[in-house]
Amino acid sequence: MKKTIFFFSILVFSSFGALTAQNNIKKQTDWITHYPDNINIPFTNSELAKLKMAYGNQLENQILDRPVRVNDVKDIFRNRIIIYQENIKHLTKIPLLSQVPIFTIYNDKISIPVFDKNNFNPLLYNFNFFSKTKQIYRVDNTNFLIVIKPRELK
């Protein structure tokens, strides 16, 4: 009798787990990125130069030969990085750009670049580009803020 109850309980609990796993109503499109139309435009010369600086001789293998990564990088360059000057005094609680490690995985010759608002290369820094929340960094000794917007998901 105990064996019958034991096997019956195993059958019930294993079936319950399978049913709850299959009945997960959560949208399956939560991880699909929505890209604005401007990612259909080819890389500009400036964007290609920034990519070459960050990826060196691994640029084709790591980015250009991978269409999803091409779209991600275009989205980062064109839609997700905002740099502006803030006029308030109390910016000390915002993390500094100098606290972000330099991204040297593919090009170990990269040194800490001097900040230039017009030529800022976000790929030189090890930012978490896949965070679900907005990230803000302050450029050292300035009132410039770098905002990294999260990806837009469908």
Residue ranges and their predicted role:
Residues N24-K154:
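Short beta-strand and adjacent turn/loop elements
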Residues M1-K26:
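Bacterial Sec-dependent N-terminal signal peptides
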